[in-house]
């Protein structure tokens, strides 16, 4: 959504394909605000349209061609790399490394995994959560090398989601609350730095 809104004024025809509902898992208010911004910026949105393959200059969903064009920017959600599952590390059903709160692999405690390659209950695959794991990862790598005690990464419940709206503002979603505007854009800019 952020990428589509950022590109909307620079790309004459822009389409966003979602395998599930737009911003699935987030509050209805945030989804409605995002839909409004996308419509206002003339971004075509296709929900429940997972892209199964790219054939030449066509996007295919199932067996149907759903888009044809010369320029494609593909942004998928987090996907486990095939080598991870083939490595012998314990993985979840999607191929992400099972990790303990110490960020160690359950099957190979000498291996640490964070971010989009790791599966830690209660932690979304998002840059925000990955960045919050870094201090614990750094401390634990140092402790492991010294033979010291490891710290647990603690999830802090649902954090607010800020999506850049492409106009200097941002959309906020938190639990069942949503808002939008320039103030939230300044907050997002501050947090991203």
What name fits each language-model region?
Residues 124, 133-193:
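C-terminal, flexible cofactor-proximal segment of oxidoreductases
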Residues 1-13:
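Rossmann-like NAD(P)H-binding beta-loop-alpha module
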Residues 11-101:
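A Rossmann-like FAD-binding core segment of flavoenzymes
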Residues 19, 116, 165-167:
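Cofactor-binding loop segments of dinucleotide-utilizing enzymes, especially the Rossmann-like FAD-
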Residues 67-135, 139, 143:
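FAD-site-proximal beta/loop scaffold in flavoenzymes
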Residues 45, 111-113, 162:
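Conserved beta-strand scaffold positions in the cores of enzyme catalytic domains, especially
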Residues 3-4, 26, 83-85, 123-124, ...:
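Short glycine-/acidic-enriched loop or helix-start segments at secondary-structure transitions
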């Amino acid at each position: 959504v952020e990428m589509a809104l950022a590109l909307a004024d620079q790309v004459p025809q822009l389409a966003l394909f979602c395998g599930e509902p737009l911003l699935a898992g987030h509050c209805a208010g945030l989804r409605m605000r995002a839909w409004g911004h996308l419509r206002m910026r003339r971004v075509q949105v296709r929900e429940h349209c997972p892209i199964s393959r790219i054939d030449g200059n066509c996007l295919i969903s199932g067996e149907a061609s759903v888009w044809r064009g010369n320029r494609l920017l593909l942004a998928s959600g987090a996907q486990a790399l095939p080598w991870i599952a083939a490595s012998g590390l314990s993985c979840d059903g999607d191929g992400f490394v099972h990790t303990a709160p110490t960020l160690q692999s359950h099957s190979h405690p000498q291996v640490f995994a964070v971010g989009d390659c790791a599966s830690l209950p209660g932690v979304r695959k998002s840059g925000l959560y990955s960045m919050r794991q870094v201090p614990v990862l750094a401390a634990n790598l140092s402790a492991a090398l010294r033979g010291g005690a490891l710290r647990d990464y603690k999830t802090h419940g649902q954090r607010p989601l800020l999506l850049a709206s492409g106009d200097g503002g941002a959309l906020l979603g938190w639990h069942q609350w949503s808002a939008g505007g320039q103030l939230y854009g300044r907050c997002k800019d501050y947090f991203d730095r």
